[in-house]
Amino acid sequence: MCIRDRIFVGDDMNWNDCEPYGSNVVKTPYIQKLANEGMSFDNMFTSTAMCAPTRQQLMTGLYPVRSGAYPNHSVVYDSVKSFAHYFGELGYEVALIGKKHYGPADSFPINYLGGVQHDTGIDGDDIDLGKIEPIVSGDKPFFLVIAQNQPHSPWNRGSDQYKAEDLTIPEYMVDSPMTRSHLSSYYSEITYMDSLLGKTLDIINKVEKTDNTISIFTSEQGYAFPYGKWTCYDLGLKTAFIAKWPGRIKPNTRSKATMQYVDIIPTLLDAVGQNPLEFDVGMADTSGNKNFDGKSFFNVIKGETEKHRDYTYGIHTTRGVINGSESYPIRSVRSKKYKYIQNLSHNNLFYNILTAEDKQNPISLLYQSWLKNAVNEEQLNWVKHYKKRPFEELYDLENDPYEKNNLADQADYLEIKKSLEARLHSWMDQQGDLGIESEMKAIYRQDRTGKGEWFSYIQKLKSKI
């Protein structure tokens, strides 16, 4: 049987803002349909809560510092290989439609089917899904990525179906008129994106290739609200991930196994009969290893185990982020129960576009609205913590899932903190991550040559801020 792969990628979407992950507000019937027919993964994580690093770790199976794509709008090192090499050499048609956010071209020899890099909200759909029909109806096996722009801001697909005044504000947000307005528009973007997933599923069904197609939906990193995107908190790093494979994945099932985006390509190679350990990724880690950072969770997909990873890792750099701090490197490690974070330049203030106070860009006024509308001192201090954080943070995720109660200075947790710190530093060493030194070099990893399709957009956006 010829196995085909299709990945549908959202953009800046919280993992829990869709029906399969508990939302009773946001209408996502097609994501739910995919979940009904496949397996939902409850503990999938990216290691960066920014678009370009997230997408490139998915495509390469490498963590960001090792690949070179660790700041936003960045590219991998020239020698790094991607899924396009591995599946192309196996005879696959490797194609992508929609948002790129990868480079250089030699590392991603992909048949690009077109699309825009940011949704303008005009002239109908921003992706012409008709262009995928020749790929999915052909005789060759295919690996197709449908890379969405939604629900990334600007939110311009309307907000009529979610009335701001009727929304219930989650406990990890501050209730303000601007919060309600933004959520209404953000939810509408998700429902619009869901409709495009529905159209994609219809195309696959029409050519009658569903039985031998692995269909995946993933939400990318978290939303562009405080404590989401641009952080190492779970609202930034946790992602929805649903896989359907008729006859191989049991319908309407869930897995609690812990995994990361770097595991996806090794898993899909394993699924088509390849040994992921035999691939040279083009860039060695500090021990000389040229294998993937990720490891296959094919046994989880087959329902043979609920065990995969014990720890996941996170990184954030503000270098090159629009309105970002000059230097605010963040590193994290997460077990099932605890999250440990180091803010390596904690004496600085944390900035990004959410804190910019730019009246021409409504998203940058949201943080100020949270300061003004906090209901009590405890909530106000939590909002202020977004900009001013200590060197260490430690959270009990089972009792504090939204990471509000920092345990790092409590003596009872000293041994737990030390153990997680050792694991974090071991991972950083293996990746060649020098902390602040790597942070300062991050700016040179950005696509400043104009190679990437999104480069001109970023330059225009910067000129307005």
Regions of interest found by a model, annotated:
Residues 398:
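C-terminal helical cap and adjacent loop that interface with cofactors, partners, or active-site loops
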Residues 4-386, 390-392, 401-422, 435-436, ...:
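Formylglycine-dependent sulfatase
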Residues 426-429:
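Beta-rich accessory regions
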Residues 436-451:
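Short, charged, surface-exposed hinge/linker loops at domain edges
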